[in-house]
Every structure is written in structure tokens, then in C-alpha cells.
């Protein structure tokens, strides 16, 4: 149990997808103008990661990994070259289901997220978490914990940045830095803050 708690904390703070690996920066910067919208997208990312990482782990270990098809009588088969397109297909299917659900039950949030909701499909934070899962050879439980933790970490980062940007609307920001300029600086300072967690040993 201690191992899973450690993995969760590490994936939220120490190995934050947005502020440590700088993954998913396009939506991170574009949707972080309002806290409510950022929270909505953050929850969507948590849901997609919590499902896609363990789902892709099952597919990879059961079908694509070298020797995974031993149960089918072909122990020498290696379909790992199909992993990228398979992972993207699974992520795209999950995002499509999420998009239809939000459109039906949460229209205001669906309209607020706009084009950025389908862009979760190509959000490199989602694919990055799946790729890390394969590289680190996580089992199913570890994949679930890592997916949830990575989603929470990314959501935390975008909500914090959105809160900072809302405050900056009423600040005296120099003309040359208004907009994305001060946003990049703020995100960089947040990343420096999260970097302090890198010395924590779990």
C-alpha cells in the first residue's frame, strides 16, 4: 500500500506532467484563463488518464508486448511496433465517449471547453502518461494509480495557473508582457516551485 501512495504522490507533485515534463502545454496555456473552465478540463483529463493508462496497459501486456501472445500459441510474436497507433486509438475512443457525455449532460461545460475537448486526444500529457507506463513496466494497479495521479497533477497545475491569471487581470502588467508573455513567466515560476519536490525521496 505504501508503494502505491508513494507512486500517487510522486506522479502528482514530483513528476508533474505539466510542470516537470512540460507535456500538454497547448491546452495548459489556452484553457487556463478561467478557473471554472480549467477545473472542467482538469476533471476531463483525470477521467481520460484514469481509464486510458490501465486500459492501454491491459492491451499492451495482453496483446502487443513481446511474447504476450503465448496464450494464443504464438510465443514469438512481437506486436509492440503497433503500440503508438493502438494507444492513440484507445485515447481517441475514450475522449469521444467523454465528449458525447458532456454534450448530453453538461452542455455549459461542453461549450466552455469548445475545441480543446477533442484536442485531449492529441494532448501529449495523455500519451506521455501511457508511454511512461510502458517504459516503466507498471502493472495494472500501478497503471491505475499513476494515471489518476498524473491527471490530478495536470489538473492541479492548470487550476493554479488559471487562478494566477485571473488575479493578473487586475494587476499592473507591463504592456509588452500582457497575455502569453506573463503567462509563460508565471508557468515557469510555478515549475520552479514544483522542482523543489524533486529532492523528496519516496
Swiss-Prot record:
The keyword Transmembrane helix applies. This is Na(+)-translocating NADH-quinone reductase subunit E. It catalyses: a ubiquinone + n Na(+)(in) + NADH + H(+) = a ubiquinol + n Na(+)(out) + NAD(+). Keywords: Cell inner membrane, Cell membrane, Ion transport, Membrane, NAD, Sodium, Sodium transport, Translocase, Transmembrane, Transmembrane helix, Transport, Ubiquinone. The chain crosses the membrane at residues 11-31, 35-55, 79-99, 114-134, 144-164, 180-200. It is found in: Cell inner membrane. NCBIfam families: nqrE. The gene is nqrE. Its main location: membrane. It is a multi-pass membrane protein. GO terms for cellular component: Gram-negative-bacterium-type cell wall; plasma membrane. One of its GO terms (biological process) is sodium ion transport. It comes from Shewanella denitrificans (strain OS217 / ATCC BAA-1090 / DSM 15013).
